[in-house]
Structure formats: structure tokens, C-alpha cells
């Protein structure tokens, strides 16, 4: 495929949740809760879900669990939402195997994070992303998050990778709006905001949508924000963006996994606790999160 004529909203979605992975009390994968959560998120306004990403605690799940989770979510909502599978690790060969496994399960696309910890050079990033993109026919989103991976995907590297027929976009958590806007204009790559605090600015730069964490508890608000922006009602988009700001503050304090699982529980949706080394919210953190969610009008 090519970015020329690639319909990212239809093929990948516009308001996607980087979905948490539900675990049972014994720490095992809770597939029933995963199906319920997927349906809840789509019912709330998401047209796409990302499974086994950062917020999905992918470093703590086995390949078999990743496949099972993907299968369950596809069965639950795959006929009415795009399901994107996280397939990135710091091992290229492992990432290729994961990509092929996700394609075999029927994923609609792949999210491939920058190899973390090992700090490869840009030449290594090009080779890594190319190998994963070559492994299947699925559309691939690069995931640029130097706050976790240390190494950024430099603009020149993204431009080079944009020529690959399967690489169609970027999830940006680097916050370089200027560079991202230039790349969107030059390459036609679909950009997705990977930082909820910058959702509205990214739309202004030409982004397709969001791969969001706060959408676990505010999917409808983000859908309304996007709709307002695309219809030209910038004042309403700004108002909605300001309303959900307390959720971004909560995520910054607690981290995406802990905030999302605690927030869902406050809304009556139990997805279990995180796996170590992530930990559940403390009573004090839950009290503060409750106040933030009420301020954002997502909790009574």
C-alpha cells in the first residue's frame, strides 16, 4: 500500500484507545473483561483500539497472551472498529514474529514502537522498522516515544521510512509539533496524537486523530472534540479540550496504566490491577483521581 490514497480514518480509525489489558485476581489474562471493555470503549465513541501497547502493559504479557487478547478483541468489536496490534519490542526478530502472529489473527494494523533500552542509531531504526513492515501486508504506524525509548525517530528517518509501502503513519509522543507538521505536509503520513495533553494542537497541525489513554474514561468527549474541530467549531473544541485537562493531569501523576484502571473502576468497569512493576492506585491517589474525573464531567 502507499500513503497516496490511503484512507487512514477508515483503515485505522480516528479516536483510538490504547487499551489496558484486563487481569483477573490471580494475575491471569481476563478475556471476558477484555471483551466487555472493548465493547464499552467502542460504544462510548472509539472507532479503533490498540491492544498490547504501552498502556496494555505489553512488556509483561507473553506472546501467547498477546495473541489471545487480540483474538478476543477482534471477536468482540472487529466488525465495527479497527483493532491495531502492538508488535514492537527491542528485538527485531521478535518483533517480526509478533507482526506475523498478529497478521495471522486478523489485526487491522500494527503499532511498532522504537526499540527501547538498547538505544540503536537511526540507521538501526530504519533497518528495524523496515524488517517489521516487510513481514506482513498490514499498515504500520511508527510509535515515536523517546520519553520511554530514549532514542527519538528523527525527522530524516521518518521521511526515509515514509517511502515504504506499508508504513502509513506515526503515533507521536515526542511533542515536536513543528517537525510533525512539516512531515505531514511533505509525506502524507497519517499522524496520531500520542499525548492527550496535545490532542487539539496536533489536530491543528493536520493529525488524523488520537491514540489516547484518557479515552478509557472520556471517549465520548474526545469524539466530540474531534467532531467539533473537523466541522470548524474551534471554540467548542477548545472548550472540550479544557474540560478534559484534569484527566491529563491525573495521567501525568499516576501513569497511564494506573490512572486508566483506577478510573475505569470508578466508572463501574473492573479490569483488575496492573501487573508488577506497575502498581494499583493508593486510596489517596484514588481520592484525587475522583476529584479530577468529576472536574472533567466523566464521573458523578
Curated annotation (Swiss-Prot):
One of its GO terms (biological process) is diaminopimelate biosynthetic process. Keywords: Amino-acid biosynthesis, Cytoplasm, Diaminopimelate biosynthesis, Lyase, Lysine biosynthesis, Schiff base. It is found in: Cytoplasm. Pyruvate binds at residues 55, 211. Pathway: Amino-acid biosynthesis; L-lysine biosynthesis via DAP pathway; (S)-tetrahydrodipicolinate from L-aspartate: step 3/4. InterPro entries: Aldolase_TIM, DapA, DapA-like, Schiff_base-form_aldolases_AS, Schiff_base-form_aldolases_CS. One of its GO terms (molecular function) is 4-hydroxy-tetrahydrodipicolinate synthase activity. The record marks 54, 117 as: Part of a proton relay during catalysis. It comes from the Bacteria. The active site is at 143 (proton donor/acceptor), 171 (schiff-base intermediate with substrate). GO terms for cellular component: cytosol. Its main location: cytoplasm. Its EC number is 4.3.3.7. It catalyses: L-aspartate 4-semialdehyde + pyruvate = (2S,4S)-4-hydroxy-2,3,4,5-tetrahydrodipicolinate + H2O + H(+). The keyword Magnesium does not apply. Catalyzes the condensation of (S)-aspartate-beta-semialdehyde [(S)-ASA] and pyruvate to 4-hydroxy-tetrahydrodipicolinate (HTPA). Belongs to the DapA family. Homotetramer; dimer of dimers. This is 4-hydroxy-tetrahydrodipicolinate synthase. It comes from Mycolicibacterium paratuberculosis (strain ATCC BAA-968 / K-10) (Mycobacterium paratuberculosis).
